[in-house]
Every structure is written in C-alpha cells, then in structure tokens.
Amino acid sequence: MQLVERPRLELSGAKLKLVLEDLVARSEEQGGVEAYVEALRIKCAMFQEVLQKEFQLREFRALCAHMSTVRRRIGQYAQAHWFGEMKKRVAALLDEDQDTDERIRRFCAAFPDDREHRWARDLAAELLHHAHPERYPLMTRWVWDARTNTGVLRELWHGDDVDGMTIDVPDSYTTFLVLREELAQYLSSNGVFRDVLLYVDVLMAQVYAGYIGERGGTYLRADFTTPEDPMLHTRRILGLDGIDQDGRSRLKAADGRAEVVE
C-alpha cells in the first residue's frame, strides 16, 4: 500500500478564535450552534435513507435542493431523460472498492470540463459526505479549491499577506481529512466534545459566510443574496434552506423555474 504524505496546514489560531466567537454570537438567538448541528444530522439521515436504496428521481431532486452550489446549475442532469445515467454515475462514486480521489475524478470527468459544470465536484463531495459523514470529510470547492486557490482553507491560513500568495496544497481526500482533524482538535480544546464532526461543518460554513459577506463577488451573490439575518449565509452554504415555507424547492429546473417538492 502506498503511503500518502500528510500536507502541512498552517492554520491561524487567531482567525479560528474570531470565527468561533462570531458563530456562537450570531446563532444565539436561533437556538445556538446546536440547532445547526441537529439540522445537519437530519440532512445526513435524509441522504443516507435515499442513497442506500434504489432511489427515485424525485428523491434525487430533493437531495439536490439541499446542495447550495449544485441546485441552481444542475438543470437538465436532474431531469427524467438524464436520470438513468446519473444513477450509474452516483453508484460508481459510492463504490468503496476504489480510491476516493479517483472516484471523484472519474465522476467529474463524465461532465464537460468547463466553468458551467464545476458544480459536479460539489455534487460528488456532498453525496459522499452526507452518505458517510465520518468516513468522508466535506470536500466541496468552498472548503478548498486548489485550482482557484480559494475556500475555507485560504481564509484560515496563517500569514499577513495571504491574498498575495498561492497555497501549494492539493484538494485531495487527505488534505480534507487533515483539515477536519485540525479543526476538530481546535473545537475539542474549546469545549466541544459531542458531534464534533458536524460542528466542524458549521464552523467551516461560518468561515465562508464571512468571506461572502466581505469579498463575495457576482458569482457568489447569485447564490447568496443580501442576508435577512446574521446566519442566512451559513444556512445556505450548508444547504439547510432547501425548501421554503410554500413547499418550493431551491432546485432550479432547466428553464430556471423552481421545482415543487411533493
């Protein structure tokens, strides 16, 4: 078995401290961080229930509605004429007989290699993570995208001139494992002892929510509009706003209409 070298992640303790304090303060009036952890637990249960069986198109669409960077772009790939092929691709992705990075690579390679299909990486990452949250850390582009040098990893990187540097760390399975491990250790050292892995997801979403609020451009604001409350960006990043009070899904059809979840 080939040994994989662990990347060295130079995370800023000062930045982590500020993010955690901000997360606790912002979520206090909405049930605290625990409310978001519980919502993620429910999301994981939903994914596991669907993906462990012969799922139907409407169920796959419901999952997509809870993936913030997928639902507006997946379009025709969440329609009936594409469903058979999509099920095959998802089955291959979840086949644990192969290397994780290779499965993700093959899944993404089945789609056109252009800007309009970068969501495929996020779809793969969300399916893996929420089907097996302990085995697979969250590996979406907003956590770390080596090609664009953006994501949570960059926002937490230690240094005075992070904006002017290229972080030479691959967006591999091992990198995401190490990142989750270090964030989990930080949370544990600050009094979090239960559901630590889900807390890591919420913490990372809060990091990226701060990025959107401060520096997010047109691309980001298409998905994350002006917040109505201090935790709106965080909920959207985590996909916890998949269905509104009228039963309308955040999933967009090929013609741009919102799907209705039955």
Residue ranges of model-derived segments:
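An N-terminal alpha-helical hairpin/helix-loop-helix interaction module that forms a charged
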Residues: 1-116, 134-144, 148-262
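Helix-hairpin-helix
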Residues: 110-130
